[in-house]
C-alpha cells in the first residue's frame, strides 16, 4: 500500500526516522528519573520550550526520550512542577508563522502565494484549536484572533 500524502504539506511520503513502538530505557543512561525531571525543569525555567528541552537532553545529556525514563511525557513532568504553557507549543509556532505571513502581506499585498500559505497555516491552526478544545488543553471559549494574539509574534 502506497503512503498517503498529508493535506497541505510538501512532503509526500512517510520516510524519516521512526521512534520505537515500545521504547525501553537504554543501557547507557546514568540518570535517575528524578535527575531527568530536575534537568527538564531547570531548562524550562531558563526559558526553553519543550521541543528545545528534548533536543538539549538528547544532544548534551544523551537522554533520547524523557517518557522512557520517567514514565511521563515531558509536558506532564513540567506541569507537575508548576510550569504550564497556556497555549500548546505546536499551536503557538503555527500562530507565530501566521503572524509573520500577515506582516509580510501588509508590505506585499499582491503576493498571492503568501496569501495561499496563510490560508493553509490558518486552516491548520483552526484544526488544532478544535482538537485541543476537545481534549481539554485549551479553554472552550478560546478564539483565534490574529490582532489579539499579535503580542506572541516576538
UniProtKB/Swiss-Prot annotation:
Region of interest called Disordered, as start-end residue ranges on this chain: 1-24
Gene Ontology MF terms: small ribosomal subunit rRNA binding; structural constituent of ribosome
UniProt key word Ribosomal protein: yes
Gene3D superfamilies: 4.10.860.130, S15/NS1, RNA-binding
CDD domains referenced in this protein's UniProt entry, alphabetically: Ribosomal_S15p_S13e (cd00353)
InterPro entries according to UniProt: Ribosomal_uS15 (IPR000589), Ribosomal_uS15_arc_euk (IPR023029), Ribosomal_uS15_N (IPR012606), uS15_NS1_RNA-bd_sf (IPR009068)
Basic residues bias (residue ranges): 1-14
GO biological process: translation
Protein origin, superkingdom: Archaea
Subunit: Part of the 30S ribosomal subunit.
Protein name, entry field: Small ribosomal subunit protein uS15
The encoding gene: rps15
